[in-house]
Amino acid sequence: MIYLAYIVIAFTAIQLMVALMNVVFKQRLPKSSAQEVLVSILIPARNEENTIEKLLKDLQQQDYQNIEVFVYNDQSSDNTANIVEQYVQKDARFHLINGSALPSDWLGKSRACHELAQHASGSYFLFLDADVRIKGAIIGRTVAMMVKNKLTLLSLFPKQEMQSWGERLTVPLMNYILLTLLPLVFVQKSWFTSHSAANGQ
């Protein structure tokens, strides 16, 4: 039994060290925005009538204006498509893609993201879930980080807004696993793609 305790203590100590490393070497986005390269905002959406309009408003209010926004309507049965269409009619940067039936060899969100990428023409692609909120100069600062560090992939850790007790119990586990088991400073230095991890929001 004592050996089991040693194993648990050792594993916990490793997690603590990884977490401390991630705090100490945490990178923040630059305060200033990058040059105005075209950024493609790609949003897969299925039955998102309660959230999609908030995100579209956020995008319109961004300081970074050189964007194109594609929303993939994945056969929604609610008012998602109509809401997006209102923005398409008013703003030439917004586009709606109505998805077809899912092929048997695809998963829903993966297929939606693939279809979105096929339509995009920006220098950078920013994938967002429909329930995400973005504020301030986040797009420009994100591009500045990628340009400065010559990155091909950048994943952000967003603030998680949790409403129910179920969300409060489960959602933090995602960041817990990443931040205590994955030393991000090594990920940034490693040439192995298998060491990469990204947030799926």
PLM features per residue range, with description:
Residues 79, 130-145:
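Acidic donor-binding/catalytic loop of UDP-sugar-dependent glycosyltransferases
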Residues 98, 102-112, 141, 145-201:
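Long helical/loop segments within the catalytic core of UDP-sugar-dependent glycosyltransferases
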Residues 1-35, 172, 184:
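N-terminal membrane-anchoring/stem segments of glycan-assembly enzymes
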Residues 19-30, 48-61:
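Short, well-formed alpha-helical segments that are part of the catalytic scaffolds
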Residues 56-102:
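Acidic donor-binding segment of Leloir-type glycosyltransferases
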Residues 113, 125:
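Short aromatic/hydrophobic "clamp" motif used to bind/position activated sugar donors
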Residues 40-48, 55, 62, 72, ...:
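A conserved hydrophobic helix/loop-capping motif in glycosyltransferases and polysaccharide synthases
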Residues 37-40, 68:
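Cell-envelope/extracellular polymer assembly enzymes that use nucleotide-activated donors
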